[in-house]
């Protein structure tokens, strides 16, 4: 199925041929206008109406139309030719001329500049047309450039070499068709001359020869053109529509198919509209580059069910029909063996001091050269971006590994880095930030930054200082020295370090000499060796020169940092507040990133730490990281402008002075960041001054004057283990500002900006903030985001929060206010379309939610090895938005099920899901963080929790409760140990809880059933319990781990078991949360699963009662001590069908708004013999299928169709089966206080709701033996119902309470006590036989009342008294005893007056004598006959009632409210 298709509206589909014959006088009747000399395609002007038009060989065809572009004339490609050449071709034709023309469109119009400004895939029709245009242009034109001639180049032949002014003048005059920059130099393609030189016109034969493709026919200057051609090859992933033209032009190198000369020339970029408007002032900026496999590479056919297609703009993309997705990447490229990064060479194979841009990039990498954000690299395979050249990065890492291996056998002595070593990594000159218009590289525009090796040539103030080396070094950081011709300058000072205490150093000072050794021209590695040789306690003399500002952004993560902390021999290195010892050599090599492209860029697009996720060997903690987490003192010089200094200040929330609240004028405040603490203003300490005093001091500075600020950056307080020691109240005063994003340093990078680290599995701390912060603190968009916005919408981006996926449909633009986190918005959601093929077992996922109006629908359990699991894109917790294009937001669960059933018939489904995007967003100081894990808190990756099976009887979503500060609360902010927002102040801490032998831990944990991304939190702390006494827990705190075991992706039951298995001591890892949100959830009885850690003393005589969850309620479990004999809460049984079925019956189902419960166990049946199942246990899965929202009939069908075996997953109940409450409607059975399930146990011998129950034999209508025996348990009327005891519900302490009193109500007892008091009625399933006396008593009762009962049955349908008795109210308020007395009174009324007055003594005596006269054998025979007769009557009544029940279930005929719904029994099925 590998084929190439094109969009119907692509211009190639509009191309047509037309043959025009000359008239009698030789006239053609077609006017040709335009031409390259006018910057236009040749196009058709006026056309004579009488001219014939047709295809060669006869036949009618489309006619030429005015305005159509001419692509070929008589087989000669004329695009890019001047008009006089086109007319020459036409004149050379004799009788007829064949034209190939196309109608103009939005992409292809007569403007040559517009078309050349676009980028297309190599080999596409658009790319070929561009090459034709350039071929034809170079017949008459010579490209121009501002660079100096190279050896062998001939001016006027290879290039026209111009000055920058001449070039800009030429561009402004409109003479150039293409303009661009490459390596800091301007290149342009001029228009051909308006008249042919010397009157010569290229003949048709010559054009045919030139366009034949032979290298011998190529003009001499095509050498330069070949460079341009190779440099202009780009991949369609960088393709963009006309609305973003500045991203569409690039001239970068493709080393895949060039000879040894090509890349050195790589010139002549296409025109860029942004350059036309304003020339680029940073010549080091480049444009995107991608290295697709060239046409010469033998990739073979596309994989099965893949096809290649073109967009209407000529962009190539690939369609995967297996998953119904599209991709820009060629799948053959992904499968091709990749060359290791460190083995990629420059095109000549020799390492010289060539630019990194001349290094070969591996397949799948793209180099982006953005006019605004500088140069960065995109790894399309691993979905990540970074500023550093990946080849250089890999080479450096390999070199570091080799050095470390060499140093392992002996004490590490750093190898001296010479220029020969440094040349292995091509040096790059420093760059300039965007605010500095001066270029970084040597160009005709501006020279390279001043450098000298002679100290006498330095201009500025010389400073001498002497520093004593402490155990932590000298206390300053150095940048620069990436190449020999670069200064080493002071970046920042470490707070309280020797340099800061000395007070002489400032940011930007150039290090001239160290101990009288001139270091001008030294590399950073050489300086490392010098500083390392100085022992601790010794002093060093430094000579500095002030007056040279840093020529690049010091906070660029690619900038090399040389710090005194890292270059000490076996000195303690402070890393994240802990002292460690490391090799000085390894640290000297880890002092930062060897510079790649330190061009102007506002922020880093990549987290340069987490190198292990790059697929490269992971370094140890980098030096820059260790320094970045320490307080730094930075000197900033700001000139006061007409509107002030360009920043605002506010009181520091933690005290200590004034902090920078907001950067208003970032170019003016270069080097200053939001959150910086102002220490000094013009050498005067202002930390003790008030806010107004500092403001007045700044106001007094005259406009135009320079102010020197000493600011402290970083050094945030580290919290103790217990959050009790930290003030949790948030400080919201007008003069109090919170930290900005940039003021919080990541533990993994020296950059204050949170860069992008994109992998399918990611840590949220490494995910990008929605917008980054540049060196001046202002919000800047992510460069990858800018790049991704230039993409077409054909590809489904992955769901991981990569910069590309951050632009997926449905994602909101989010803005982080760096001055007030009270307004900070948690990143929103992103959507994705997922196409799944159905397997034999289904689509492989389950659906939750949709039970209430407006309730979201979520993806539940992902079945292992199912279709969804194999595809890998769908996750538990994803919100379902659409099913096959049908929106399901706010729809019912049933509708989604129906849609999925329809999709199952088709064999595939297209799902649109929405997933919350979690980024690392630092919070303000003293702000209560959301209970979420972060890189501070736990080692496990934080992700959306995948609930394998949440066995709670609930489906509804747990709504996120906002704490009012813009952050989500504990319940809705993360999964069990899952993702959330990062707290910069509060960290997770461990809490150990010990309990006594006769007590529980004393806490309730809350887990969201239908919101897998919600965490597991404390819902209640029991007063006086061990949890309360420890003083470290509060409601809302979230649990991250139990006894060191992460609960990420663990279900509620797994967490329960972890705590239960802990014994008398449990250690919990906690992150503080929000108490109010959880309290609200508990009091509102939300559908959450709770666990009570109470414990019943073993001395208690009665067993503690445990109720089972009812639908849409809380489920509670107890943690009993190990000495308490009880079974696990959850268990699995596998039953084999017996002669009469599986031996159990069910109650419940979705149609009754109940979960499924075990109602009865057949005597000596398989279920009873297995020894695990008990009455009241909740059935969670049947043969692997969840019972959530399962109908009663579906459960029967699963069991019957499962063959000889059935596998059940159950949750232990308390022996009571919940009743159905018809008044609750969709709210399910009534709940008790605090959402505790209310259970009204009745005599287990009665059957509360036959309509909700089923038992299962293969013989559907045969009654089992135990059913026959149960027939005598009916009341005198044959009613097998028992009414609930209305106001009794069991607590978790095993006690019950009566809220109402009734005169005839039996004494309240727990189920065990009930069974103890009535042994003959303990077994609901009839597992215990009644005593012979009780059976004989039942026989006599049946014998005496059968006739009267049969007569009464015929009348009770019309009896008003009966109807009243059957009302729900009467049913609720009547106990079995009261019903029996009422029945006796009713029967008594039917007797004759004589009988009501009481029979005569003689009659009573005769009756007694007759009973005495009967033999035991006769009584047993009569009893057996009567039982058989009763069973037949009851069976017939149940069948009739079942039919009535089905009719009453119809939506069009709802059951009458006065009649008792679901009373009558449907056919009892024995399993």
Swiss-Prot record:
Keywords: ATP-binding, Cell junction, Cell membrane, Cytoplasm, Membrane, Nucleotide-binding, Nucleus, Phosphoprotein, Repeat, Tight junction. Residues 734-744 have a biased composition (Low complexity). The keyword Transferase does not apply. SMART domains: GuKc (SM00072), PDZ (SM00228), WW (SM00456). Residues 990-1074 are annotated as: Interaction with FCHSD2. One of its GO terms (cellular component) is plasma membrane. Residues 300-333, 359-392 form the WW domain. Gene3D superfamilies: 2.20.70.10, 2.30.42.10, Guanylate Kinase phosphate binding domain (3.30.63.10). It holds the Pfam family MAGI_u1. ATP binds at residues 103-110. It comes from the Eukaryota. Residues 233-261, 395-455, 578-615, 712-753, 764-783, 792-813, 925-977, 1092-1123, 1212-1471 are annotated as: Disordered. Residues 17-105, 464-546, 635-713, 833-915, 990-1074, 1132-1214 form the PDZ domain. Residues 427-437 have a biased composition (Pro residues). GO terms for biological process: endothelial cell morphogenesis. GO terms for molecular function: ATP binding. Residues 96-287 form the Guanylate kinase-like domain. Residues 578-594, 931-943, 951-960, 1092-1110 have a biased composition (Polar residues). SUPFAM superfamilies: P-loop containing nucleoside triphosphate hydrolases, PDZ domain-like, WW domain. CDD domains: PDZ0_MAGI-1_3-like, PDZ1_MAGI-1_3-like, PDZ2_MAGI-1_3-like, PDZ3_MAGI-1_3-like, PDZ4_MAGI-1_3-like, PDZ5_MAGI-1_3-like, WW. Residues 1259-1319, 1334-1376, 1383-1471 have a biased composition (Basic and acidic residues). The modification Phosphoserine is found at residues 357, 722, 733, 792, 1051, 1341, 1392. The keyword Signal does not apply. Plays a role in coupling actin fibers to cell junctions in endothelial cells, via its interaction with AMOTL2 and CDH5. May regulate acid-induced ASIC3 currents by modulating its expression at the cell surface. PANTHER family: MEMBRANE ASSOCIATED GUANYLATE KINASE-RELATED, MEMBRANE-ASSOCIATED GUANYLATE KINASE, WW AND PDZ DOMAIN-CONTAINING PROTEIN 1. This is Membrane-associated guanylate kinase, WW and PDZ domain-containing protein 1. The lineage of its organism: Eukaryota, Metazoa, Chordata, Craniata, Vertebrata.
């Amino acid at each position: 199925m590998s084929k190439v298709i094109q969009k119907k509206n692509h211009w190639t589909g509009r191309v047509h041929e037309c043959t025009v014959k000359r008239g009698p006088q030789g006239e053609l009747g077609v006017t040709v206008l335009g031409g390259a000399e006018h910057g236009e395609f040749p196009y058709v002007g006026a056309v004579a109406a009488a001219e014939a038009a047709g295809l060669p060989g006869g036949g009618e065809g489309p006619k030429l139309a005015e305005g159509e572009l001419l692509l070929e004339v008589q087989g000669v490609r004329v695009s890019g030719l001047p008009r006089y050449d086109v007319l020459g071709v036409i004149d050379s034709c004799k009788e007829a001329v064949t034209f190939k023309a196309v109608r103009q469109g939005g992409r292809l119009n007569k403007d040559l500049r517009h078309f050349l400004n676009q980028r297309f895939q190599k080999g596409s029709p658009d790319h070929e047309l561009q090459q034709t245009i350039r071929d034809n242009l170079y017949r008459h034109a010579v490209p121009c450039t501002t660079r100096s001639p190279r050896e062998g180049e001939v001016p006027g032949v290879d290039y026209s070499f111009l000055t920058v002014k001449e070039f800009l003048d030429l561009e402004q005059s409109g003479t150039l068709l293409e303009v661009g920059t490459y390596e800091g130099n301007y290149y342009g393609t001029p228009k051909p001359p308006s008249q042919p030189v010397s009157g010569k016109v290229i003949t048709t034969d010559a054009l045919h020869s030139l366009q034949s493709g032979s290298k011998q026919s190529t003009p001499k200057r095509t050498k330069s053109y070949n460079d341009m051609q190779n440099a202009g090859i780009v991949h369609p992933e960088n393709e963009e529509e006309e609305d973003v033209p500045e991203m569409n032009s690039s001239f970068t190198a493709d080393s895949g198919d060039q000879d040894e000369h090509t890349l050195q020339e790589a010139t002549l970029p296409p025109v860029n509209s942004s350059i036309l408007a304003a020339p680029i002032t940073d010549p080091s900026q480049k444009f995107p580059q991608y290295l697709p496999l060239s046409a010469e590479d033998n990739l073979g056919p596309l994989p099965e069910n893949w096809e290649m297609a073109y967009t209407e703009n000529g962009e190539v993309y690939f369609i995967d029909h297996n998953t119904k997705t599209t991709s820009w990447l060629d799948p053959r490229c992904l499968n091709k063996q990749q060359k290791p990064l460190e083995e990629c060479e420059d095109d000549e194979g020799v390492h010289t001091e060539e630019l990194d841009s001349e290094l070969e990039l591996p397949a799948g990498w793209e180099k982006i050269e953005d006019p605004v954000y500088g140069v960065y690299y995109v790894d399309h395979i691993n979905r990540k971006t970074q500023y550093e050249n990946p080849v250089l990065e890999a080479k450096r890492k390999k070199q570091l590994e080799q050095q470390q291996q060499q140093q392992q056998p002996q004490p590490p002595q750093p190898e001296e880095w010479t220029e020969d070593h440094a040349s292995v990594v091509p040096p790059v000159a420093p760059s300039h930030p965007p605010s500095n218009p001066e270029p970084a590289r040597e160009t005709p525009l501006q020279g390279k930054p001043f450098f000298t090796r002679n100290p006498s040539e330095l201009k500025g103030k010389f400073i001498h200082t002497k520093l004593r080396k402490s155990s932590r070094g000298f206390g300053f950081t150095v940048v620069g020295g990436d190449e020999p011709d670069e200064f080493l300058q002071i970046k920042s000072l470490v707070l309280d370090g020797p340099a800061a205490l000395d007070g002489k150093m400032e940011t930007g000072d150039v290090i001239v000499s160290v101990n009288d050794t001139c270091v001008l021209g030294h590399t950073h590695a050489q300086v490392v060796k010098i500083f390392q040789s100085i022992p601790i306690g010794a002093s060093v003399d430094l000579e500095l020169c002030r007056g040279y500002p840093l020529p690049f952004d010091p906070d660029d993560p690619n900038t090399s940092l040389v710090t005194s902390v890292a270059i000490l021999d076996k000195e303690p290195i402070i890393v994240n507040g802990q002292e460690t010892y490391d090799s000085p050599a390894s640290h000297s090599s880890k002092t930062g990133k060897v510079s790649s492209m330190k061009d102007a860029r506002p922020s880093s697009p990549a987290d340069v730490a987490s190198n292990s996720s790059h697929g490269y060997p992971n370094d140890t903690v980098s030096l820059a990281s260790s320094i970045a987490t320490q307080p730094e003192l930075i000197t900033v010089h700001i000139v006061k402008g007409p509107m002030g200094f360009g920043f605002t200040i506010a009181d520091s929330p933690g005290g200590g002075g004034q902090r920078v609240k907001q950067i208003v004028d970032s170019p003016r405040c270069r080097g200053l960041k939001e959150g910086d603490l102002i220490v000094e203003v013009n050498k005067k300490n202002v930390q003790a001054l008030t806010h107004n005093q500092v403001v007045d001091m700044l106001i007094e500075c005259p406009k135009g004057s320079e102010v020197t600020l000493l600011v402290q950056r970083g050094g945030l307080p580290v919290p103790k283990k217990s959050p009790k020691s930290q003030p949790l109240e948030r400080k919201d005063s007008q003069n109090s500002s919170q930290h900005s994003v940039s003021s919080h340093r990541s533990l993994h990078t020296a950059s204050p900006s949170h860069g992008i680290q994109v992998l399918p599995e990611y840590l949220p701390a490494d995910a990008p903030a929605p917008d980054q912060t540049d060196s001046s603190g202002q919000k800047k968009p992510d460069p990858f985001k800018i790049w991704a916005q230039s993409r077409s919408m054909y590809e489904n981006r992955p769901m991981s929060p990569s910069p590309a996926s951050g632009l997926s449909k449905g994602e909101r633009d989010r803005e982080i206010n760096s001055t007030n986190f009270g307004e900070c918005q948690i990143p929103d959601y992103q959507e994705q379309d997922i196409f799944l093929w159905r397997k034999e077992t289904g689509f492989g996922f389950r659906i939750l939610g949709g039970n209430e109006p407006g309730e979201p629908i979520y993806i539940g359990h992902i079945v292992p090895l199912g279709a969804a699991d194999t595809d890998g894109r769908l996750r538990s917790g994803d919100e379902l938005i659409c099913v096959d294009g049908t929106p399901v937001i706010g729809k019912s669960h049933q509708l989604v099920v129906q849609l999925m059933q329809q999709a199952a018939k088709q064999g595939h489904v297209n799902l649109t899901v929405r997933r919350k995007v979690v980024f690392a967003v630092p919070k303000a100081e003293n702000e209560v963080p959301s209970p979420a894990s972060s890189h501070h808190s736990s080692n496990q990756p934080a992700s959306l929790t995948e609930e394998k099976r949440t066995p709670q009887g609930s489906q509804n979503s747990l709504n996120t409760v906002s704490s009012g500060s813009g952050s989500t609360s504990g319940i809705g902010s993360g999964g069990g140990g899952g993702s959330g927002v990062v707290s910069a102040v509060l960290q997770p801490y461990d809490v150990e809880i010990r309990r006594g032998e006769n007590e529980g831990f004393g806490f309730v944990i809350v887990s969201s059933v239908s919101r897998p991304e919600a965490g597991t939190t404390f819902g209640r702390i029991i007063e006086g319990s061990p949890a309360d006494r420890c003083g470290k827990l509060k409601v809302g705190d979230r649990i991250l781990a139990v006894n060191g075991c992460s609960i990420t992706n663990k279900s509620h039951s797994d967490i329960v078991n972890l705590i239960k298995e802990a014994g008398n001591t449990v250690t919990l890892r906690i992150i503080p949360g929000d108490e109010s949100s959880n309290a609200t959830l508990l009091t509102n009885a939300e559908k959450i699963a709770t666990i009570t850690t109470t414990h019943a003393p073993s001395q208690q005589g009665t067993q503690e009662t445990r109720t089972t969850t009812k639908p849409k309620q809380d489920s509670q479990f107890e943690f009993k001590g190990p000495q308490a004999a009880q079974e696990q809460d959850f268990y699995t049984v596998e039953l084999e069908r017996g002669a009469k079925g599986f031996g159990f019956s069910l109650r419940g189902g979705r149609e009754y708004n109940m979960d499924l419960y075990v109602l009865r166990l057949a005597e000596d049946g398989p279920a009873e013999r297995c020894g695990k199942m008990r009455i009241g246990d909740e059935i969670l899965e049947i043969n692997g299928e969840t019972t959530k929202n399962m109908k009663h009939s579906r459960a029967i069908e699963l069991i019957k169709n499962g063959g000889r075996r059935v596998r059940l997953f159950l949750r232990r109940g308390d022996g009571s089966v919940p009743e159905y409450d018809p008044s609750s409607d969709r709210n399910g059975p009534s709940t008790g206080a605090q959402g505790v399930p209310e259970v009204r146990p009745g005599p287990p011998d009665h059957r509360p709701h036959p309509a909700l129950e089923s038992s299962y034999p293969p013989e559907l209508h045969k009654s089992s033996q135990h059913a026959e025996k149960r027939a005598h348990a009916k009341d005198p009327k044959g009613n097998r119902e028992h009414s609930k005891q209305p106001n009794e519900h069991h607590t978790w302490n095993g006690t019950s309470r009566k809220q109402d009193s009734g005169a005839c109500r039996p004494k309240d007892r727990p189920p065990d006590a009930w069974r103890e008091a009535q042994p003959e009625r303990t077994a609901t399933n009839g597992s215990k036989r009644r005593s012979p006396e009780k059976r004989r008593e039942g026989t006599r009762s049946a014998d005496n009342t059968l006739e009267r009962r049969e007569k009464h049955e015929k009348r009770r349908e019309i009896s008003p008294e009966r109807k009243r008795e059957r009302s729900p109210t009467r049913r609720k308020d009547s106990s079995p005893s009261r019903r029996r007395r009422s029945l006796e009174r009713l029967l008594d009324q039917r007797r004759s007056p004589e009988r009501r007055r009481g029979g005569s003594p003689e009659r009573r005596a005769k009756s007694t004598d007759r009973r005495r006269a009967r033999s035991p054998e006769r009584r047993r025979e009569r009893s057996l006959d009567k039982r058989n007769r009763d069973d037949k009557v009851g069976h017939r009544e149940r069948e009739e009632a079942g039919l009535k029940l089905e009719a009453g279930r119809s939506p069009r005929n709802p059951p009458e409210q006065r009649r008792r719904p679901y009373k009558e029994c449907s056919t009892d099925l024995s399993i």
